[in-house]
A protein has these predicted regions:
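C-terminal helical cap(s) of enzyme catalytic domains, especially alpha/beta-barrels
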Residues: 1-2, 70-79, 231-239
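Internal, glycine-rich beta/alpha segment that forms the wall or movable "lid"
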Residues: 1-56, 81-90, 98, 126-158, ...
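Short, acidic/polar
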Residues: 42-52, 203-217
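Short, conserved secondary-structure transition motifs
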Residues: 91-107
Length: 239
């Protein structure tokens, strides 16, 4: 693809590719892009995804729940770049983040709690738990405790049409159980806590300060805003 974006074999879009899996010959019928090639964004936090991003991407769309987690991810990915002959500025770390604004911190916190409960219904909580456990958990009470048995890691690596998001499923399950016991969380409340992307909650001034802190302290190079309502959420943020 990069070869085609660069003008092909003759600089005019011609190509003749012979590969292991397929062969193709022809001419690209669109002019070369002024910027050379489209921006390549890799999405995901897996080890394979990080390596692909370090090798080939311009930006990585990620998610993490705290400043410390963001800094660890940032350092890990940036450290992979030199072996591919790339500098730190060649790859931008852009976590997807939500935000909830209020005239006061208390109002923002109240709005945030309501938004999260709307996002994670009783049924959704069970479905998200099934994606980790790789089992049918439809008989479990969403407000009850987590399963006392381990996830099924012997079968497929895809649950409910989605690939697994965790490199170590059993370790993640243990962490969730520990968090559930420590904070006395039922399934739904736990899922609300562990599945939410990074949220900036507060007054506009507080949110701006927090976002700047993440950039200045090497947890991100910027952000991809993910409002809970579109388009009104973006409009609220801009205003």
């Amino acid at each position: 693809a990069r070869h085609l974006w660069s003008g092909g074999d003759d600089g005019q879009g011609s190509f003749d590719y012979q590969g292991r899996q397929f062969a193709v010959r022809g001419r690209l019928d669109v002019p070369p892009l002024p910027q050379g090639h489209p921006i390549i964004i890799q999405a995901g936090d897996s080890t394979q995804g990080r390596e692909f991003a370090a090798r080939s991407a311009d930006a990585i769309f990620t998610r993490h729940g705290s400043l410390a987690e963001g800094q660890a991810f940032y350092a890990d990915v940036k450290a992979r770049l030199p072996k591919y002959g790339r500098a730190e500025h060649d790859l931008k770390i852009l976590p997807g983040v939500g935000f909830v604004l209020g005239d006061t911190p208390e109002e923002a916190a109240e709005r945030h709690a309501e938004v999260r409960r709307q996002q994670v219904s009783l049924q959704t909580a069970i479905v998200l738990l099934e994606q980790l456990w790789n089992r049918d958990l439809s008989g479990f009470d969403p407000d009850g405790p987590l399963p006392d048995f381990d996830p099924d890691v012997s079968a497929t690596t895809v649950a409910k049409g989605r690939t697994r998001q965790h490199d170590d499923t059993l370790a993640t399950a243990r962490q969730w159980r520990e968090l559930s016991r420590r904070e006395n969380l039922g399934i739904r409340d736990l899922i609300i806590k562990v599945t939410g992307r990074q949220q900036f909650v507060g007054t506009p001034a507080q949110v701006a300060e927090d976002m700047n802190r993440y950039v200045q302290q090497n947890a991100s190079d910027g952000f991809i805003l993910v409002p809970h309502l579109i388009p009104s959420g973006i409009e609220e943020f801009v205003d």
